[in-house]
Amino acid sequence: YAARQEKIEKLLNTASRELSEKQKNYWQDMNSKVDEPFQYGYYEGWEIIISSFELLMFALLAVCIVIAPIFSGEYEAGTDAVILSAKYGKTKLTTAKIVASYLFGALAFTLHVIVAFCLPLAAFGFDGWDLSLQIVNTTIPYPWTFLQAVLVNLGVVYLVLFAMLGLTLLLSAKMKSSYLVLIVLVPILFIPLFLSPNGTTGAYNLTLFLLPYRSTVPEIGKYISYQLGGLVLDAFTMRAILYAILTAVMLPLARLGFKKHQVG
């Protein structure tokens, strides 16, 4: 365990990482919360889940494709004039469309998650859920078990889902074709797939780690941190805050976009 601490100190003090003292202290404090000694065991099923999170992007895309016509489909069908001129067309009906989109999106995505998680666990068993992540790599800083890591990252993935649903609804309210919605949405979701980080610091890398595709990847072995003045946040916390804010911004804009739509 002394060797582990030496590795961590060497890693944090690597010049190329350009970590501030506050960031180093943040990671040292987190590492001090890791329970020792480590208990070893079998964890194959959980490791597969953690290493395959990015595949959920395809489920996320499928959900967004389904809800893309929620507003733009009305424009294409010419029913927008009827809906918007109705008594509750600009209020309750618009809200109902948004709520229905989120309920469908959450339920459909959850079904994908259940299938995606059950397959490796059925094949390799549930063993290892309570084991420390450090048995995979001793320098992992997060003081979590495999199950805790899966749940934390899954929470972030759901926030990404909600933000992307909000973006889809906003685009649908603003564009007259569902195809145009997807033309904008697909690159946002999948261009990061073809971009690779060259480190864990610098504007390029820190931005890349926050894009939708990369935000589904746990990156539990990387010391990715964001310093905002005197505040230091790890990747999980930063992603959660960012996508929660985006969701809160997108929803009223989507509602307003359909409400203000000019029938033509």
Positions of predicted regions on the chain:
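Hydrophobic positions on the alpha-helical face of helix-turn-helix-like DNA-binding modules
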Residues: 80, 93
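Short helix-to-coil transition segments within interhelical loops
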Residues: 84-90
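Transmembrane helix irregularities
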Residues: 86, 174-175
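Transmembrane alpha-helix boundary/hinge residues in polytopic small-molecule transporters
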Residues: 78-79, 166, 182
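Residues that define the loop-to-transmembrane-helix transition and helix capping
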Residues: 91, 178-179
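Membrane-helix interface linkers and caps
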Residues: 75, 81-82
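Secretory targeting signals
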Residues: 3-74, 95-174, 194, 220, ...
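Terminal transmembrane helical anchor/hairpin motif
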Residues: 126-148, 179-182, 187-261
